Amino acid sequence: MSKIFVNPSAIRAGLADLEMAEETVDLIARNIEDNQAHLQGEPIEVDSLPEDMRRLQLDDTKPSGPGEIAATGESKCQEDFQMDEAEDPALLFQSYLDNVGIQIVRQMKSGERFLKIWSQTVEEIISYVTVNFPSLPGKSTEDKATQTASRELKKETVSAPSQRDSQSSKTKVAAQTASGPPALEWSTANEEDDPSVEAEIAHQIAESFSKKYKFPSRSSGIFLYNFEQLKMNLDDIVKESKNVPSVTRLAHDGSKLPLRCVLGWVALAKSKKFQLLVEPDKLNKIMQDDLNRYAFP
């Protein structure tokens, strides 16, 4: 009977691979437990669900009449958009600003320039506000004073457009003279169409067009979704993606984009099925975490 000899180096390499695999599994498990505990569960396929999700009855007691069905749906929508006192956005925002202040002090102690720190902080705060304070559909978040100011601003825009342009240019010159944060100039540059930026965004989205990402559902589980299920033209997806904070800057620098955040942003704006499936508060937290990880590593 012949003997099979195994090279000791191959055994050592195999053991090293096993150790690396175990460490990778442990790391993934810790990440899921620490940061994405709400995403645990069996994912569901969105394609297998009906277009009109409101036909599904998740309660044990079924409404008897059309009026009761309408009342139940209305109360359910109100519950979805209500937030507990423990999750008051104002308190969360105050805590976030406190952490930002601590981070600025640490960076200044390490010797970084204030203008560089401030420009990054401005973009980070704008990103946080945009993601965590979205305007709810069908509801106005403006108070009477804000509405009055908006109407007055609109009248001034219609009556004197040249005056507005002049004031805008003066403001920009004054900001440059005072050596203000350079992040203000970036917001203006974002509004301009840059073919190279659009090409970079389209390239990264196209590479992951059929890749499915996990999103939190209203049933405390998860569901899978991808760009292909949007059933949108790639140009339209790119156009909407440019509204995501920091995405245009990342594409301009050739950096990797937070595609799950981009998909969630576009789907929340364009897909009714996605709006009915996703849990808004958890989605906002996931999108903010993705933006912080990619835009401010």
Curated annotation (Swiss-Prot):
Modified residue annotations for Phosphoserine: 64, 162, 210, 271
Composition bias, Basic and acidic residues: 140-157
Keywords: Chaperone, Cytoplasmic inwards viral transport, Host cytoplasm, Host nucleus, Host-virus interaction, Inhibition of host innate immune response by virus, Inhibition of host interferon signaling pathway by virus, Inhibition of host STAT1 by virus, Inhibition of host STAT2 by virus, Inhibition of host TBK1 by virus, Inhibition of host TLR pathway by virus, Interferon antiviral system evasion, Microtubular inwards viral transport, Phosphoprotein, Viral immunoevasion, Viral RNA replication, Virion, Virus entry into host cell
Keyword Phosphoprotein: yes
Compositional bias of kind Polar residues: 159-179
InterPro entries: PP_M1-like (IPR004259), PP_M1_C (IPR037199), RABV_P-like_C (IPR049506)
Region (Disordered), start-end ranges: 137-198
Posttranslational modification: Phosphorylated by host PKC and by an unknown kinase.
GO cellular component: host cell; host cell cytoplasm; host cell nucleus; virion component
UniProt entry tagged with the keyword Phosphoprotein: yes
Region ranges (DYNLL1 and DYNLL2 binding): 138-172
GO process annotations (BP): microtubule-dependent intracellular transport of viral material towards nucleus; symbiont entry into host cell; symbiont-mediated suppression of host cytoplasmic pattern recognition receptor signaling pathway via inhibition of TBK1 activity; symbiont-mediated suppression of host JAK-STAT cascade via inhibition of STAT1 activity; symbiont-mediated suppression of host JAK-STAT cascade via inhibition of STAT2 activity; symbiont-mediated suppression of host toll-like receptor signaling pathway; symbiont-mediated suppression of host type I interferon-mediated signaling pathway; viral transcription
Entry GO MF terms: RNA-directed RNA polymerase activity
Motif (Nuclear localization signal): 211-214
Motif placement: Nuclear export signal: 49-58
Role, per record: Non catalytic polymerase cofactor and regulatory protein that plays a role in viral transcription and replication. Stabilizes the RNA polymerase L to the N-RNA template and binds the soluble protein N, preventing it from encapsidating non-genomic RNA. Also inhibits host IFN-alpha and IFN-beta signaling by binding and retaining phosphorylated STAT1 in the cytoplasm or by inhibiting the DNA binding of STAT1 in the nucleus. Might be involved, through interaction with host dynein, in intracellular microtubule-dependent virus transport of incoming virus from the synapse toward the cell body.
UniProt similarity note: Belongs to the lyssavirus protein P family.
Name of this chain's protein: Phosphoprotein
Natural source organism: Rabies virus (strain silver-haired bat-associated)
Lineage: Viruses, Riboviria, Orthornavirae, Negarnaviricota, Haploviricotina
This protein's encoding gene: P
